[in-house]
């Protein structure tokens, strides 16, 4: 059976996932969704893009790159917010693989897929494979809606500060004041000294200006707030992206070839490359009181 795959995100992880899919003969069509555009700072790890692509939509450029070089695979780009797409869009795919860098879109797609499964009485059950990276660490969650733990079941495994901003494309679509601070401090003025009072006051001024451009509240903005954000910024590492993307695609291949026990097999993989290379897989159990997938909420 030929497969139609949906990839969420065309950043560092999404590019790696898309590259891997070009090498799978059973994958005939891939749709990729991303609202962001390409920035100079992306080019060190998002290798489907180059200098001439700066300012262009990521999904569009990634699709064009693959379609030109791999004619056996059709890639369709969607330059939009995935939360604006209707449920009918998602039900056409055999697998959905996420390379997203934000929490809320993951929660949205998880809830959408669980709802599709339950409302169809399991006639529609689309595996959702979620990859995530944070510096030299990463994870892969394999979710079979209505059968295994859903994404919401494991939300308590996230760091307590969920709004820690990864080093990704925030230039054209800042959603909060944290995104503003990251852009100003790491892209516009990366050489300022955070120990200098004058430099921190300058950053505060520039953050206020950028926030005003995007109608973002500056209520909690201060030099101490900016310092806290700068210290929490996590870089994106290409090798971690490659390992997580490979694990995502391996899980998909296992499911496609019926090589995994969907109900009782391991569905959560942790990757830690901060001291050597460590990978650990285990079964994450469903929460009986999960607000998305528990029996009490699905009736």
Swiss-Prot record:
This is NEDD8-activating enzyme E1 catalytic subunit. Catalytic subunit of the dimeric UBA3-ULA1 E1 enzyme. E1 activates NEDD8/RUB1 by first adenylating its C-terminal glycine residue with ATP, thereafter linking this residue to the side chain of the catalytic cysteine, yielding a NEDD8-UBA3 thioester and free AMP. E1 finally transfers NEDD8 to the catalytic cysteine of UBC12. InterPro entries: ThiF/MoeB/HesA, ThiF_NAD_FAD-bd, Ub_act_enz_dom_a_sf, Uba3_N, Ubiquitin-activating_enz, UBQ-activ_enz_E1_Cys_AS. It is an enzyme of class 6 (ligase). Pathway: Protein modification; protein neddylation. It comes from Saccharomyces cerevisiae (strain ATCC 204508 / S288c) (Baker's yeast). The keyword Transferase does not apply. The active site is at 168 (glycyl thioester intermediate). GO terms for biological process: protein neddylation. Coiled coil: none annotated. Belongs to the ubiquitin-activating E1 family. UBA3 subfamily. One of its GO terms (molecular function) is NEDD8 activating enzyme activity. Its EC number is 6.2.1.64. SUPFAM superfamilies: Activating enzymes of the ubiquitin-like proteins. GO terms for cellular component: cytoplasm; nucleus; ubiquitin activating enzyme complex. Present with 752 molecules/cell in log phase SD medium. ATP binds at residues 12-37. It catalyses: ATP + [NEDD8 protein] + [E1 NEDD8-activating enzyme]-L-cysteine = AMP + diphosphate + [E1 NEDD8-activating enzyme]-S-[NEDD8 protein]-yl-L-cysteine. Keywords: ATP-binding, Ligase, Nucleotide-binding, Ubl conjugation pathway.
């Amino acid at each position: 059976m030929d497969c139609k795959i949906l990839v969420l995100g065309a950043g560092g992880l999404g590019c790696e996932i898309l590259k891997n899919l070009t090498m799978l003969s059973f994958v005939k069509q891939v749709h990729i969704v991303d609202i962001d555009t390409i920035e100079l700072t992306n080019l060190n790890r998002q290798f489907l893009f180059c200098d001439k692509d700066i300012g262009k939509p990521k999904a569009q450029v990634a699709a064009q790159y693959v379609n030109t070089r791999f004619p056996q695979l059709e890639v369709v780009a969607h330059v939009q917010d995935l939360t604006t797409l209707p449920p009918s869009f998602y039900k056409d795919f055999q697998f959905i693989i996420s390379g997203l860098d934000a929490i809320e879109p993951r929660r949205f797609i998880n809830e959408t897929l669980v709802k599709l499964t339950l409302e169809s009485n399991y006639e529609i059950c689309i595996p959702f494979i979620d990859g995530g990276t944070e510096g030299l660490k990463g994870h892969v969650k394999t979710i079979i809606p209505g059968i295994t733990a859903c994404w919401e079941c494991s939300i308590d495994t996230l760091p307590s500060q969920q709004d820690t901003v990864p080093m990704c494309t925030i230039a054209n679509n800042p959603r909060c004041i944290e995104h503003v601070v990251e852009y100003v401090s790491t892209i516009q003025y990366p050489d300022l000294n955070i120990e200098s009072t004058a430099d921190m006051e300058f950053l505060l001024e520039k953050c206020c200006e950028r926030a005003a451009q995007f109608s973002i509240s500056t209520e909690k903005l201060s030099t101490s707030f900016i310092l806290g954000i700068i210290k929490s910024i996590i870089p994106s590492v290409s090798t971690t992206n490659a390992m997580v993307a490979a694990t995502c695609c391996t899980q998909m291949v296992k499911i496609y070839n019926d090589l995994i026990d969907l109900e009782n097999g391991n569905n959560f993989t942790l990757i830690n490359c901060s001291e050597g290379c460590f990978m650990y897989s285990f079964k994450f159990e469903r929460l009986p009181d999960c607000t998305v997938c528990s029996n009490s909420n699905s009736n």
